[in-house]
Amino acid sequence: MTATTTTAAGGGKVQPRGLPVALSLLLLLVLAAGLGGGAEAQQTCAGQLRGLAPCLRYSVPPLPGQVPPAPGPECCSALGAVSRDCACGTFSIINSLPAKCALPPVSCQ
């Protein structure tokens, strides 16, 4: 994933902001976990997503010219604990948000 400048619906530029972007993404993931399925499934998925905190530093694009760090064992373990249903449901919710906010879709290469 690379950091790029995108144009918001109002024509303004949206700049990535490093750690705040990653924190926002993590918060979004946790919130998204609570938006679908039964209460038990929501709690399970939310817990799995909260467990991804050790991955936060690996989810921020590096500065130009820097090499992204390899994820540590705590991150890899936490990522392995996220169920497919939880991950796919969260990605689906996140992908639907721009349209719900009258923003252009996010396209990643």
Curated annotation (Swiss-Prot):
Gene3D superfamilies: Plant lipid-transfer and hydrophobic proteins (1.10.110.10). InterPro entries: Bifun_inhib/LTP/seed_sf (IPR036312), Bifunc_inhib/LTP/seed_store (IPR016140). Pfam families: LTP_2. Residues 1-41 form the signal peptide. It is found in: Secreted. Tapetum of anthers. It comes from the Eukaryota. Disulfide bonds join C45-C86, C55-C75, C76-C101, C88-C108. The keyword ATP-binding does not apply. Keywords: Disulfide bond, Secreted, Signal. GO terms for cellular component: extracellular region. Belongs to the A9/FIL1 family. This is Anther-specific protein MZm3-3. It comes from Zea mays.
